[in-house]
Regions:
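Glycine-rich, often proline-containing surface loops adjacent to acidic residues and nearby aromatics
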Residues: 16, 76-85, 192-203, 221, ...
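Short beta-strand-to-loop capping motifs
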Residues: 84-88, 249-252
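Conserved catalytic core of two-metal-ion nucleotidyltransferases
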Residues: 44-48, 66, 98-156
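Short N-terminal edge-element motif at the start of the domain
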Residues: 50-52, 57, 95-103, 200-209, ...
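Extracellular/secreted glycoprotein ectodomains characterized by long, lumenal stretches
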Residues: 72-74, 85-90, 102, 142
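Extended, alpha-helix-rich binding/interface surfaces that flank or overlap catalytic cores
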Residues: 70, 135-207
């Protein structure tokens, strides 16, 4: 069945607006994520924490940072990704950094049963449909700026193989700033967080004030959830969808505040490429 997107179709416009509204987290879900983040950040950084001497800088990254989180689909969960950066050099072994933050979380009777080891983060699995991922990190002195190094652990934490463990360079703050620059502003939003110990999760944007690009990313992510529901391991990660969307916006000759117009331009091009190269799965 051919799928044709017509940007002038007012019915499609209205339908996509309705979908966008329904993709937003509920107020309860949003406040729940913020509350859990604040509690974990406080536990990691407060007075008496063994991490305190390393000046922990805790900040959100990913979808919650840029406002593109979507309501869970089917049995999926929504999450909040965070970074806990310590003032250490890369002479510290990746596994040692991971262990330091793991041990601090393990000290909490609340977090201990919720902890799950992931290759580049520690996951806290809450009851219901939410989990919080905490990525240990240090400053990436080679690349500078906001770049950080995160552990990439290929072995079980209890059986570390140092020769297989390494650092991965990433820049979640830079990625978020770049994405915000691609957004067509509904209003000027250029707030910069001070270098505080714990950065708050950015305030939730009302749907009518959310830039078109952010709504497009949410729609694309829901398309991904539906399209790959029976093959989740093949689903493109959110960072890829976000980057492709941002690049599409950056090459547009005319900015648009219309979600359907922007989305149609982006998806039409991708679907045409997909028909030729099957690059969308």
């Amino acid at each position: 069945m051919a799928f044709n997107i017509d940007a002038s179709n007012h019915t499609l416009d209205a339908l996509l607006e309705i979908v966008c509204v329904n993709l937003q987290l509920t107020e309860t879900q949003d406040q729940r994520a913020r509350g859990h983040y604040a509690s974990v950040a406080n536990w990691l950084s407060r007075e008496g924490s063994p991490l305190r001497e390393f000046s922990p800088h805790i900040f959100p990254q990913g979808s919650q940072r840029i406002g593109t989180t979507t309501k869970p689909f089917g049995r999926s969960e929504f999450d909040l990704d965070a970074v806990c950066k310590l003032m250490l050099t890369d002479e510290c072994h990746p596994g040692e950094l991971y262990q330091m933050i793991w041990d601090r979380l393990f000290e909490s009777a609340t977090y201990r049963p919720m902890m799950k080891q992931m290759p580049r983060c520690i996951r806290l699995e809450y009851s219901g449909d939410f989990h919080l991922d905490i990525a240990p990190a240090i400053l990436d002195e080679e690349h500078g700026g906001n770049c950080i190094l995160v552990p990439d652990l290929n072995a079980n934490l209890a059986l570390l193989h140092p020769e297989n463990d390494c650092w991965k360079s990433t820049n979640p703050i830079g990625q978020a700033d770049w994405f915000e620059d691609q957004c067509v502003p509904v209003f000027v939003l250029n707030e910069k967080y001070a270098r505080a110990q714990v950065d708050p999760v950015p305030e939730k944007e009302a749907i009518h004030a959310k830039p078109a690009l952010k709504r497009c990313v949410q729609l694309y992510k829901r398309w991904r959830d539906v399209e790959y529901a029976d093959r989740p391991k093949l689903a493109p990660p959110s960072i890829i969808l976000t980057t492709l969307s941002g690049r599409s916006a950056g090459t547009s000759t005319k900015a648009s505040n219309s979600v359907p117009t922007h989305l149609s331009q982006f998806l039409t091009g991708r679907f045409r490429r997909s028909n030729r190269t099957n690059d969308l799965g």
